[in-house]
Amino acid sequence: TAVSTGSGLLAILVGAFSGVAVAAIFAVLTLTFLANQVATGLALTIFGVGLSALIGSSFVGISLEPLPQLSVEFLSTIPILGELLFGHDLLVYLSFIMILLAGYFLSKTRPGLILRAVGESHDSAHALGYSVLTVRYLAVLFGGFMSGLAGSYLSLVYTPLWAENMTAGRGWIALALVVFGTWRAGRIAFGAYLFGAITILQLHVQGWGINIASQFMTMLPYIATVVVLVLISQDRIKIKMNAPQSIGKAFRPAK
C-alpha cells in the first residue's frame, strides 16, 4: 500500500485491518467451530508467513519512505532525555497512549470488567447474562488490529522496506511477554520496552567498538525470552493466580 499510494498512514490502516481479517478467521475457527486454539494459531501463523511471502514477492528490496518523526525542537535537545523521549514517530507515542488506555479500560470501565469476567469464568459470565462469544470475538479482533499495527511498524519504520519473514518470530516474544507481565498492562509494557531495548542493543554494540559476533546479538532477544520464562516459571503459584482461569478454554453454553 505504501509503495502503490505513497501514503504511510493508509499503509498503517491497511496493515492493521489485515490483522483484523486474520484474527476474524481465527475467531470463527476457535469460537464458532471450537477448533483447538493452539493448533489453529500455529496453522494461521504458517499460513500468514506463506501468504505474506507470496503477496510481497514483487516488493522485495523496494525502499519505503519512513514515517516522519514528531520532534519538538527545544525538547529534543535536552541531554539524554531529549533523544530518549522526543523525536519519535507517531506510532511510538501511540503505544504510550494505548498502554494507559488498556490499563484504564481493564480496571476502571464496565466493558473492561466484563472482559475480565469472561476471561476468569466464561460460565459465570454467561449465567449473569453476558454474551461470552461477543466479548471474545471483540477481544480477538482488537488483538488482530494491534498485531497488524505492529507489523506495519516493522515494515514502515523499523526497517522501511519489505523482506520475507521480516518479523523473525517477534510475535512469539510478544506472546511470552504476556506471561512475563502476568497479564497486567503495566508489567507487560515494562517487559516490552525491556525486550525492545535488548533488540536495539544489537544495532549499537558494534558501533561502540565491542567485538561481539553479530549472530549472537541477533539471538540475544530470544535467549533473553527463554531465560526470563524459565525464571518466572519458578513462581508457578503467582502465575496461576494472575492467569485468567478460562484462557484457552472453549465455551460451550449450557442448553
Protein language model features and the residues they cover:
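Transmembrane helix-bundle core of multi-pass membrane transporters
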Residues: 48-108, 209-217, 244-255
